[in-house]
């Protein structure tokens, strides 16, 4: 019975394009962002923000947390704009990647705290806006199953992303900086995919 209801939820998502588009938004961020969760730890171990690595890691995660919380507050007007709303999910993924690409290129000094803050502020907009849109577009009967699918896709993609980056580093295929750049490029690509394919359809819904 439970499995059938889950299956019915997936069919409902498949048959409803406005829901289907948005349910992948967090997973698109996580294609690169999943790896960045643990790459941030490795950055903290190399960056010199304190006498011990744990302090540097904590400071980086504090910047990440403040960014995730502040981004949606600052971006609230953007999320309400009919002109910007159709493309905002794509841009939020895109710019999250851009700032991690910058992190891969600059010296790991205090400046990366600002870059981490801005990147995760952008991804925070993605998380809040995608959740809000799913709530708005889904009837009560399906809301739990849609939300469950949303987080299933997110956590699965985070796992695949982290595993892939871990294997790349362990195998010595890329350096830490190069791996960070790769995850950033993946996010930029995912954001571009949303902007090219999803934004026009989102605009049609508003118009």
Annotated model-derived regions:
Residues 1-24:
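Juxtamembrane intracellular "pre-TM" segments in multi-pass secondary transporters
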Residues 23, 39, 113:
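Phosphate- and divalent-cation-binding pockets in alpha/beta enzyme and binding domains
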Residues 21-31, 150-154:
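Alpha-helical segments in transporter systems
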Residues 11-15, 33, 45-46:
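Residues at helix-coil transition
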Residues 7, 45-207:
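C-terminal transmembrane bundle of multi-pass solute transporters/carriers
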Residues 42:
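Contiguous, function-dense segments enriched for cysteine-driven chemistry
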Residues 29-37, 158:
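Conserved extracellular-gate-facing transmembrane-helix segments in secondary transporters
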């Amino acid at each position: 019975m439970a499995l059938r209801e889950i299956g019915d939820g997936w069919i409902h998502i498949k048959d409803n394009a406005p829901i289907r588009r948005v349910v992948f938004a967090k997973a698109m961020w996580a294609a690169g962002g999943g790896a960045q969760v643990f790459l941030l730890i490795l950055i903290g171990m190399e960056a010199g923000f304190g006498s011990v690595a744990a302090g540097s890691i904590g400071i980086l995660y504090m910047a990440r947390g403040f960014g995730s919380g502040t981004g949606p507050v600052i971006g609230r007007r953007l999320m309400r704009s009919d002109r910007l709303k159709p493309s905002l999910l794509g841009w939020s993924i895109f710019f999250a990647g851009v700032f991690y690409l910058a992190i891969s290129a600059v010296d790991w000094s205090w400046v990366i705290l600002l870059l981490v803050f801005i990147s995760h502020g952008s991804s925070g907009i993605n998380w809040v806006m995608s959740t809000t849109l799913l709530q708005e577009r889904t009837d009560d009967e399906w809301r739990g199953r849609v939300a469950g699918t949303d987080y299933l896709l997110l956590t699965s993609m985070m796992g695949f992303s982290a595993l892939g980056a871990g294997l790349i580093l362990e195998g010595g295929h890329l350096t830490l900086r190069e791996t960070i750049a790769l995850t950033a490029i993946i996010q930029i690509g995912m954001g571009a995919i949303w902007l090219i394919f999803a934004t026009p359809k989102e605009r049609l819904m508003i118009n």
